[in-house]
């Protein structure tokens, strides 16, 4: 079903799956006819309209080059759309001034496939950094960093450097860092791409638990077995276009 969006003169509103319509509250993410081009003959996204509500766990599926990573970058303002409008937490990302981008990113947690941990800092320091940049008091930083590491089962290794941990453990640290300031949105770009099957489930269970606590989660993955296992709403992309918006339980 297509509705009309609240901004601009869109030709039709964002795609809403049945699962989305049942969700409570207003959408935290809304895209209206979004396209992203890197030059002639290099179009990453084409006329994408979709919305995601609070507490949804949504998979972004598609082959390499489908536009999954580009969409993630647009949502946390690492890039700007060539056309269209993007509302994230009520803010028009396409028009957001550079000075206001940090405030938006403080409410968005991001997990990358390659972890992006600071190798010269301890596990606890990596997680604490997300709170320190917000100016939180040292006592609160230590308490919340420890509590989050305990949630992912790594509090006993908090003083070690990332290189001492396995790939799965480093990904858990990256997830703890992304969630420690209780973001409204979590973006996970191929978070299990380098992990074996057992560790993949371990990480995805933590991601699903974040959604159950009310965080809106988008997970980019090409792992169809993972999508079938969790049976959540799935946006299938190909060639930068949205081919299907499949409600949870339909795969």
Give names to the regions the model predicted.
Residues 76:
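Helix-to-loop junction immediately C-terminal to a conserved catalytic motif
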Residues 84-92, 104, 144:
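Conserved ABC transporter NBD signature motif
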Residues 93-109, 138, 212:
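ABC ATPase NBD coupling module
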Residues 121-129:
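Short coil-to-helix segment of the ABC ATPase nucleotide-binding domain corresponding to the Q-loop/switch region
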Residues 161-165, 169-171:
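Conserved ABC ATPase signature
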Residues 182:
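Conserved catalytic motifs of ABC-family nucleotide-binding domains
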Residues 186-189:
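Catalytic Walker B motif of ABC-type/P-loop ATPase nucleotide-binding domains
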């Amino acid at each position: 079903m297509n509705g009309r969006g609240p901004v601009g003169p869109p030709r039709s509103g964002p795609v809403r799956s049945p699962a989305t319509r049942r969700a409570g509250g207003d959408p935290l993410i809304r895209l209206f006819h979004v396209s992203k081009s890197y030059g002639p003959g290099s179009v990453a996204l084409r006329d994408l309209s979709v919305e995601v509500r609070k507490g949804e766990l949504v998979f972004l599926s598609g082959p390499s080059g489908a536009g999954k990573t580009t969409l993630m970058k647009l949502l946390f303002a690492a890039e700007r759309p060539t056309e269209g409008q993007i509302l994230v937490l009520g803010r028009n990302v396409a028009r957001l001034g550079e000075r206001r981008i940090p405030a938006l990113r403080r409410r968005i947690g991001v997990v990358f496939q390659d972890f992006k941990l600071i190798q010269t800092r301890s596990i606890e320091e990596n997680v604490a950094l997300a709170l320190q940049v917000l100016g939180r008091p040292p006592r609160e930083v230590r308490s919340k960093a420890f509590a989050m590491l305990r949630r992912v089962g790594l509090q006993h290794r908090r003083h070690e450097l990332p290189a001492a941990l396995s790939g799965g453990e480093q990904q858990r640290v990256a997830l703890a860092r992304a969630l420690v300031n209780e973001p409204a949105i979590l973006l996970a770009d191929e978070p299990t791409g380098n992990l074996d099957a057992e560790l993949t489930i371990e990480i995805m269970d933590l991601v699903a638990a974040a959604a159950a606590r009310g965080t809106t989660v988008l997970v980019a993955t090409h792992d169809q077995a993972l999508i079938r296992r969790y049976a959540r709403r799935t946006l299938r992309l190909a060639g930068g276009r949205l081919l299907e918006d499949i409600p949870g339980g339909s795969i």
